[in-house]
Regions:
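Catalytic NTP-binding/metal-coordinating core of nucleotidyl cyclase/transferase enzymes
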Residues: 1-65
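Short regulatory "switch" loops immediately downstream of catalytic or recognition motifs
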Residues: 3-6, 48-52, 75-76, 125-136
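Alpha-helical scaffolding flanking metal-ion-dependent phosphate/phosphodiester catalytic sites
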Residues: 95-97, 117-130
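Intrinsically disordered, glycine/charged-rich C-terminal tails and inter-domain linkers
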Residues: 129-276
Length: 276
């Protein structure tokens, strides 16, 4: 799920703006990864990567690389838009996995896909306005965070049916738990210990038990691409001011997208460098 969340400039033709700076460039990437466009919905694109018998079972790992390339492409377009005095595009991307074939409804000759992964990716790509206002100044290198509020002020870190989770996803890629588990089946993920310079405000939202995992994704024509995954606990916050209370036992997963992080990868040529 790819969602455009930036306001349009007054007087601009929205259709032309989306087509030129988002839809057309993304369509070229979809062809590269043999991905299908399920449908357009307002300011969003729903994309599917299907696994077929006889093909390499790498749908999630290649979806991660596709999402990374989309964000990289948008960063380049945003530089041009900024120089032209036009509003920049901001995306939130979500990757969900369903371990079964999708169903289809027929509308004449047109197939309409029915899949739980569509709704899940929509949720993963979302960004709560209040959370964005709170976290945006302190997001740092990471682009995805998840907060939880509860009706029970004495919550001990567990989860209940009353809990509400809210996402921060600005220029990020959020991975569902089933997608993360499928990714671990597709490629080997190794722990990566690295210390980045962060302000005290940025560190506050970083889980001290969080992990960074790095893996290599095989692509077409013998190419490979490194990806980094951040695994973090969900933060329990005070509903009144979104101040951090404690860390819960829930997890969320981010496909790291910041070029500075990939530039720090040891050894092999990083994904960021390969885009130059």
């Amino acid at each position: 799920m790819l969602k455009y969340i930036s306001p349009m400039e007054k007087g601009m033709n929205a259709a032309s703006y989306f087509s030129l700076n988002f839809y057309e460039p993304v369509n070229k990437l979809l062809t590269k990864y043999n991905a299908g466009k399920v449908f357009l919905e307002g300011d969003a694109i729903i994309v599917s990567l299907l696994e077929r018998e006889g093909d390499a079972m790498l749908a999630v790992s290649r979806a991660c690389v596709l999402a990374w390339e989309i964000l990289s492409l948008v960063r380049g377009y945003n530089e041009l838009l900024e120089r032209s005095g036009l509003p920049q595009m901001e995306l939130g991307l979500g990757i969900a996995y369903q371990d079964s074939a999708p169903l289809y409804l027929m509308d004449g000759d047109h197939r309409i896909m029915i899949s739980d992964a569509i709704n899940e990716s929509d949720r993963l790509s979302s960004c709560n306005k209040r959370v964005r206002k709170k976290l945006a100044p302190d997001a740092g290198l990471f682009r995805v965070y998840r907060l939880q509020i509860s009706a029970n002020a004495d919550s001990d870190g567990g989860s209940s049916s009353d809990d509400i989770t809210m996402n921060y996803n600005v220029g990020g890629i959020c991975l569902s738990e089933p997608a993360f588990e499928k990714l671990r089946q597709e490629i080997s993920l190794a722990p990566w210990k690295v210390n980045f310079k962060s302000t005290a405000a940025e560190k506050k939202w970083l889980d001290d038990q969080g992990e960074l995992l790095v893996g290599t994704v095989p692509l077409a024509n013998g190419a490979f691409r490194k990806i980094a995954i951040r695994k973090s606990r969900v933060a329990q916050v005070d509903v009144r001011d979104f101040s951090l209370l404690h860390w819960t036992d829930r997890r969320y997963y981010e496909v790291c997208a910041d070029p500075a992080l990939y530039a720090a990868l040891p050894g092999e040529k990083s994904a960021a460098e390969s885009q130059k």
